[in-house]
Amino acid sequence: MPRSARTNTEINSDATKLRIPATVLESMVDAITDAVPTDSIYIFGSYARREERPSSDVDIMVITESDDERPLRYATRASMSISRLMHDAGLDYDLLARFRDDYLDRKTRCTTVDYAVANEGVRIYG
């Protein structure tokens, strides 16, 4: 079940490393955690490395608490929940979702996106 609506979500202190406004990150976390059962949220890729360019998108990984639905459905719901916010902020994005157990299994395999998330990602929630 999605979490109940909240306001003033606290984002992790590591999120201050990102060049994304805190208000955008907080609203993104609120929207995603309201849409899907969320364990954690990471930003990875060029924004996490602080190498973003004007054409860069924000890469987001949502780790879910539950495997009640397929990851694609969780990703779709999470993506729909932040679409307007990201558009209004002028940010393109890619969003992936993983079940927690699948992420934990894959994050040590250097050929997976999960490995990149684990090694360069910035946890903004969870």
Residue ranges and their predicted role:
Residues 46:
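Conserved H-loop
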Residues 1-40, 49-54, 64-126:
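Catalytic core of pol beta-like nucleotidyltransferases
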Residues 59-63:
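Short beta-strand->loop micro-motif that forms the acidic, two-metal-ion catalytic signature
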